[in-house]
Amino acid sequence: MQITMGYLQENLRQQTLAGIFSTSQPTISRAINNVLNILDVVLPPPPQPVDLNPNRLYVLDGTLIPCWWWKNARNLYSGKHHRAGHNLQVLTDQAGEIFYISEPLPGSTHDITAIRSTGLFSYMQPWHCTADKGYVGLGCDTPFRKRPGKPLLDWQRRFNKGINQIRYVVERSIAHLKVWRILSTPSRLPQPTTIRAINVIRKIMFYQPPAEPYFPSN
């Protein structure tokens, strides 16, 4: 467990961890895989769109989780970010508390496509979400786009400024999420293990330990 948590938090090379724990790199690799498999099974699932309060006001943004670019997974490359990774959709309230993190999708997935795939707006109205220009057309509160040869009006600029002030909280929350360095620096794990690691962190972020130990009756 200590090895796996250290790996997720610091994204150290497995050879480095092998030196720290006086063992071999294959042993470190097996330990990480075994613990990730166990955590993925025993941790409760993270919140789903159906679990969210549809009357709450949210802030929505996407982020790229960088990873190694495997030749057999060309869809991981994000033209927007010019690197390979996985797309995560993050939903916070207007105070910045994270309420939802989507499953990872290939980095080439556009934010609109990614959020549609979650089914989020089957459970709430899109205007309950503030988002950036990448979500224009969904019905969310988004900034006005400047059209060629048509500068924004003063009230539109003020509106955009207000939207950006609201959106700041989700950007800050994503930065806090990426304290897990496996989410902010390219992972060297195989692609299936990388996805499993991301999903384990999603579960850890929402895990609430029982207030009291539970002992089933005979």
Regions picked out by a protein language model, each given a short descriptive name:
Residues 1-10:
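Short, amphipathic alpha-helical "recognition" segments used to contact nucleic acids or chromatin
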Residues 10, 14-218:
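Short, well-ordered secondary-structure "scaffold" segments embedded in the functional core
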